Amino acid sequence: MNNSMISPSVVDLKAKTGDRYSLVVITSKRARQIIAGEEPLVDIESNKALTIAINEVDQDKIKFDLPIEGIN
């Protein structure tokens, strides 16, 4: 599969979230908030909650904390 055709790219999104796991958790939680009635923070043509959430991450519209590596 050619990821260069996907916008935003998974590589770019991983750079913002740290890893794929965090990307999935962040976007799925935000998608659930949108489904529950929260207003989208971006104006895009899609009405799919996950697509909106992905674009919000890409456009730095949502805040999240990256986990600290290791356990003390």
From Swiss-Prot:
InterPro entries: DNA-dir_RNA_pol_omega, Pol_omega/Rpo6/RPB6, RPB6/omega-like_sf. GO terms for biological process: DNA-templated transcription. Pfam families: RNA_pol_Rpb6. It catalyses: RNA(n) + a ribonucleoside 5'-triphosphate = RNA(n+1) + diphosphate. Its EC number is 2.7.7.6. Keywords: DNA-directed RNA polymerase, Nucleotidyltransferase, Transcription, Transferase. SUPFAM superfamilies: RPB6/omega subunit-like. It comes from the Bacteria. GO terms for cellular component: DNA-directed RNA polymerase complex. One of its GO terms (molecular function) is DNA binding. PANTHER family: DNA-DIRECTED RNA POLYMERASE SUBUNIT OMEGA. Belongs to the RNA polymerase subunit omega family. Promotes RNA polymerase assembly. Latches the N- and C-terminal regions of the beta' subunit thereby facilitating its interaction with the beta and alpha subunits. The RNAP catalytic core consists of 2 alpha, 1 beta, 1 beta' and 1 omega subunit. When a sigma factor is associated with the core the holoenzyme is formed, which can initiate transcription. This is DNA-directed RNA polymerase subunit omega. It comes from Clostridium acetobutylicum (strain ATCC 824 / DSM 792 / JCM 1419 / IAM 19013 / LMG 5710 / NBRC 13948 / NRRL B-527 / VKM B-1787 / 2291 / W). The gene is rpoZ.
